[in-house]
Regions:
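Conserved short strand/loop->alpha-helix "switch" segment adjacent to the catalytic nucleotide/phosphoryl-transfer site
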Residues: 17-41, 97-100
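STAS-typified acidic loop motif
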Residues: 2-14
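Short, structured helix-loop boundary elements
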Residues: 9-12, 33, 37, 57, ...
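Hydrophobic residues in the alpha-helical elements that line and stabilize the ATP-binding pocket
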Residues: 43, 47
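Acidic-residue sensor for enzyme active/binding pockets
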Residues: 41-42, 74
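Structural signature of the histidine kinase catalytic ATP-binding subdomain
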Residues: 7-10, 28-31, 55, 66
Length: 139
């Protein structure tokens, strides 16, 4: 399923709700859905606020699919090239709560099994994959 969305927070939430419904209909565990919803909201918000700078006239795509035991969410936008996966892994500590930025990708990595970025034909493509048999990252 592919959603064509305007760059607004409301459209990000529409994508999250659509993904949740699709996942429920396909028998995905509620803990997994919760994590995927957080990851999609984080990535979608970054597309809207950073890549497309909150310009509601701009559009981006969210593609959602379940293929066997893989659940895939792909976000595509035509904003400036930016690879969020290039951020180094960091351990979260309570004292880091006041530090600005950079933590969203850590959240996304926590709730997915694979995060891949590519630049294809002028588009940022961020692909989030969750293996549905894996519960280790959900705890």
């Amino acid at each position: 399923m592919t959603l064509e969305l305007h760059a607004t927070p409301e459209e990000v939430m529409r994508a999250v709700e659509t993904m949740q419904q699709f996942a429920e209909e396909n028998g995905v565990h509620e803990k997994t859905i919760f994590g995927l919803a957080l990851a999609l909201e984080e990535c979608g918000s970054n597309v809207v606020n950073h890549a497309l700078q909150g310009d509601a006239e701009q559009k981006f795509q969210v593609c959602i699919e379940k293929n066997g035991d893989l659940f895939v969410i792909e976000l595509r936008d035509r904003g400036p090239e930016f690879d969020p996966t290039a951020a180094a892994d960091r351990e979260m500590h309570a004292e880091d709560d006041d530090l600005p930025g950079g933590w969203g990708i850590q959240l996304v990595r926590r709730y997915t099994d694979e995060v891949r970025y590519s630049r294809i034909a002028g588009e940022n493509v961020l692909r989030l994959t969750k293996r549905l048999g894996t519960a280790a990252k959900q705890e």
